A protein has these predicted regions:
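Cleavable N-terminal signal peptides of Sec/SRP-targeted secreted and luminal proteins
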Residues: 1-18
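Catalytic cores of secreted/periplasmic or lumenal enzymes
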Residues: 17-274
Length: 274
């Protein structure tokens, strides 16, 4: 299962700033117009002037936005950025090891080649941390997709060149209980997991079934919408991972999963919270 989230949830122990990125999405959102959110991790968000955010992140945001935009919405590089954010975080926390220790070459990270090539170049150009940049790129990618929510971002993670243990990412053939327990052990609720897996709304698979390479998990892979939930349950999606079917039927997850069908506001809210 290539759940493509955990953007901001692991490895954020030494955070310096928190921000959302107004104006990174070409689709207007009133929440993006109110300004930059900056705060210490331990206190509530506060609206603060853009000047309080290091300019480098605004520069990177502009550059990434342009590279993530495609015809009709977000493109394949954006999809890779969303997935990479999850893959870097899940095993040992968000520490940049995905791109600092050769993990991109593992079979479990097939399909991330383009983002694994791009982000180290951006890091070298601007002198930011790899762990921070991977999560920032994932957040920008979500916002660039039409209907994507504004994503808070926390800077200050510690980079690591120590590879994570291979084979620890959720499996595309995992049972519902197995997958739920993996996430529960990391502090996620059933609603969190149901929301996070919805990132498959922008997913296209190339390696699970090579005969159907490029098949999406719903009919609108360029849009951050809830079509994934309804189409997966109805069996009308172009392609569905076995793990997704299993999670949608899992006793704890199936309720919130069904609750996101046709409910964009509820899903966006749950995804950001998760």
């Amino acid at each position: 299962m290539h759940v493509s989230a955990l953007l901001l949830l692991l490895g954020t122990y030494s955070l310096v700033h928190a921000l959302t990125v107004p104006g990174t999405s070409p689709w207007p959102d009133k929440h993006l117009e109110s300004g930059l959110r900056i705060a210490k991790r331990s206190v509530p968000y506060e609206i603060a002037p853009r000047a309080l955010c290091p300019q480098v992140w605004w520069t990177i945001a502009t550059e990434l936005k342009l590279s993530f935009l495609g015809v009709g919405g977000c493109n394949n590089l954006a999809r890779q950025a969303i997935r990479a954010a999850f893959h870097d975080c899940f095993v040992d926390g968000c520490n940049g090891s995905l791109m600092l220790s050769g993990e991109c070459d593992r079979s479990e990270n097939n399909g991330l080649e383009d983002i694994c090539a791009q982000l180290p170049t951006v890091r070298a150009k601007y002198g930011v941390g790899m762990a921070d940049l991977i999560q920032f790129a994932g957040a920008i990618a979500v916002e660039v997709c039409p209907l994507g929510p504004p994503m808070p971002f926390y800077a200050g993670r510690k980079d690591s060149t120590t590879p994570s243990t291979p084979g620890q990412l959720p499996s595309v053939t995992g049972s519902g209980d197995q997958l739920f327990n993996m996430f529960k052990a990391k502090g996620f609720t059933a609603t969190d997991l149901a929301a996070l897996i919805g990132a498959h709304t922008t997913s296209e698979q190339f390696f699970v079934n090579k005969a159907k390479a490029g098949a999406a998990q719903d009919t609108t892979p360029n849009v951050w919408d809830v079509a994934y939930y309804g189409q997966m349950l109805a069996g009308t999606a172009p392609f569905t991972f076995e793990s997704d079917k299993n999670l949608a039927a899992q006793n704890d997850v199936k309720g919130p999963f069904k609750g996101f069908v046709g409910n964009q506001v509820a899903w966006n809210g749950a995804f950001v919270v998760a």
